[in-house]
Amino acid sequence: MTETPTDLAALETERARLRETYQSAQRPVSSARGIHHTALISSDVERTIRFYQGILEFPLTEVIENRDYKGSTHFFFDVGHGNLLAFFDFPGLDVGPYAEVLGGLHHLAISVTKESWDHLRSKLDAAGVPYQVESGASIYLRDPDGARIELLADPLGEMYGSTVL
């Protein structure tokens, strides 16, 4: 990502305008039931399973053929509260390396308890997985294909002590 100079005061003014224009004191009920799954691309199914189930302790729930691309594997991990993290592989297609691009994934934040956060940090250390700690509550790491994952020791609906839901 390329950084461009910004007027921080103007950005905060714009955020305030957006809140005033679009946030309602009486927030309506969402039309959505939740996120069914988020799907990423895997270059190696077994390596991805070893990482997400073996290190991050997200149980593998299913391995099926991708209905849209014969020969492709679609597999799922339980990330709690009925949410799934899914992957596809695309054998024979050159999908290129992971890239953070406009419209693409910046990171996927997964809420864990403080106890799990400490435990998973120890497992990352033992496995030699590099990571960055932010604010004492976030661990940012990259999966085997380069996707950025955040393990966040804040409850669902909170972000760094602020209620966001």
Regions found by a protein language model. Name each.
Residues G34, T73, H81, G104-H106, ...:
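Residues that flank catalytic or metal-binding motifs in active/ligand-binding sites
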Residues I41-L84:
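Core segments of cupin and vicinal oxygen chelate
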Residues T6, D44-E46, G103-R148, A153-L156:
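Vicinal oxygen chelate
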Residues L84-F90, D94-S111:
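Helix-adjacent hinge/juxtasegments
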Residues Y22-S24, E62, G71, G92-P97:
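A short, acidic/glycine-rich surface segment
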Residues G92, P155-E158:
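A short acidic/small-residue loop/turn micro-motif
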Residues T2-E46, L105-L108, V112, G161-L165:
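N-terminal beta-strand motif that seeds the catalytic metal site of vicinal oxygen chelate
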